[in-house]
Amino acid sequence: MRLKQAPWLLLCDVGPIPGLDDPNHLTSTADGFPSPSAVADASRSVSPTPAEAAQLSSKESQKLRPKTKDPAAHLIYIRYLQRNQPIRTAIEKFGSGYQDYLQAPLQPLTDNLESVTYEVFEKDPVKYDWYERAIAQALSDWSEQRKPTSSPSGAVVIAVAGSGRGPLVTRALRASEMTGVAVEIWAVEKNPNAYVLLQRHNEEDWGRAVNVVKSDMRAWKGPLRATTGPIGQAITTATSAPASPYGKVDILVSELLGSFADNELSPECLDGVQHVLAPQYGISIPSSYTAHLTPVLAPRLHSDISHRAITDTTATETPYVVMLHAIDYLATSVPGHPQVQEVWEFVHPLPSSTLAIAEARRGGGVSGGGGGSMSGGDGANEHNTRSARLKFVCKDRGVVNGLAGYFEAVLYDGGEAGKVELSTRPDTIDAKSKDMISWFPIFFPLKV
């Protein structure tokens, strides 16, 4: 198997250093270094005195004597390698101890995440910078193109759906300050613990500039503007239907992506909140995302999952989030068949016609829909069904223990200004989002 990283050093025919374990045997050493030739490795705190330097100079003028074999030369070279090894990347530092450690994917829609989980995600040095860039670019384009806003004051309305502890809200405020474009921000969060912290941030950090809402994003009706009419006013059949007290959102910001893009129900959540988005000019950040796969040889993961399968029959049918380490990529890149291939794509916002058909199916208004739970579902989510058939070219023989999954996301497409993108693919992460640590790859095991 081709090793992904260099192995440990293997020393052959190396015994104990002569005299090192004998207290009665004196060896010539240089201030604690195991060899006279190691003086070059010493720090400047052990530099020779002027007298010693003069003595060394006089010795150099004498005839050089043949040197004996240094019994500790291998230690000198190991120290040299240790000092000159490349600096670990951000992902290597963050993932230390997590290599090939199987984890179950998060389910933020079902579970309320703990504060420590939010804290880990907020340490990402790249993701939130990229989100801030995307929001700032969107605000600049909005102002330059003179698009109408959904706010009575003329401010661009931004909703952060699933705002957690508020890092995206902070970045949205920074983007507004950087671009000089006024914004009206709504933070929507269902987690009661995170909601309390959002209120605290709003009081202490954001100057009460944010409207904090405790709600599932799919049940949120939009920014509350005004009542339907004066209190006590009767509505008769002759009067027209009252206007909705809820406004629209210009920019919908979310971070619902999983390791395989859609595996944490991002499409379903964004479909459920799209009704608050302005129909003509509203945009979503991210605007699209794609899932990617490649076959891998992973004997360590295969062994771990096989042991789990003894007591858990679903172990081989469960996807795992894991920092892949002891693996080998079996596929090679050839024309038409790259090593890592795109599986499917989701785009937001969806066309209004697609959502209308989904709602009709939910209510049974379309032939074939409305079957209900007794028929296995009502078909309202059929537009999010995806399937793919991929062909990989493997040059060398090997056992495919599973499929490694990645994703790419376009946060904002600024046209000529370029795209703001995220990627976890090993061949594009450095170009699109170097040192991003928020997502490990996902591993789909195969029964062999």
Task: For every predicted segment, state its role.
Residues R165-V181:
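Conserved SAM-binding loop of SAM-dependent methyltransferases across substrates and taxa
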